[in-house]
Amino acid sequence: MMAARDFAALVAGGLIAAASVFPAYAQDAAAVAPAAPANALEVELNALAPSQKGCMMTFVALNKLAAPVNKISFELAFFNDKNAVDKITVLDFRDLPQGKKRVRQFDMPNVKCEAVTRILINDTPVCDGPAAGECMKGLVTRSQISVPFEG
């Protein structure tokens, strides 16, 4: 009986010790994880949906730069399943106020959503306003769907 009680106390003590170690490990891991840059222009590929014209593309942009962008356009390259560029086009994202999220949709004629395997922001031909020159430098891309989105 005494051995069972000692064993139970030992197990309980071990669980308490383990529980006190793991939160510290999680905090250390979080401290080491890379943070998103403070001065960033985040552009997310949010959705691709078939449309009557071709493919409706939805993007979410967040301007974390130190200033607003009065007008911006992105040159996008669309890749197919052979990793070949199918189309290059320029999309006008209009203005991106500082600290604000904006949703932009583009109906791409003669593009089949299912044929798009990757999208690349090749350039920012227009980046006007106080943040001019920072658009490509601060660009951070991500995709909410299975199609990779790179910058």
Model-derived segments and spans:
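Bacterial N-terminal signal peptides that target proteins for export
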Residues: 1-11
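Low-complexity, acidic Ser/Thr/Pro/Gly-rich terminal tails and inter-domain linkers that flank the onset
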Residues: 27-54, 58-60, 138-140, 144-150
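Bacterial N-terminal signal peptides
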Residues: 10-20
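The feature marks short-to-medium sequence segments in extracytoplasmic or secretory-pathway proteins
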Residues: 62-98
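Short, solvent-exposed, Trp/other aromatic-anchored flexible loops in extracytoplasmic proteins
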Residues: 87-128
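C-terminal structural segments of small proteins and small subunits
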Residues: 126-139
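Sec/Tat signal peptide C-region and signal peptidase I cleavage site
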Residues: 21-26
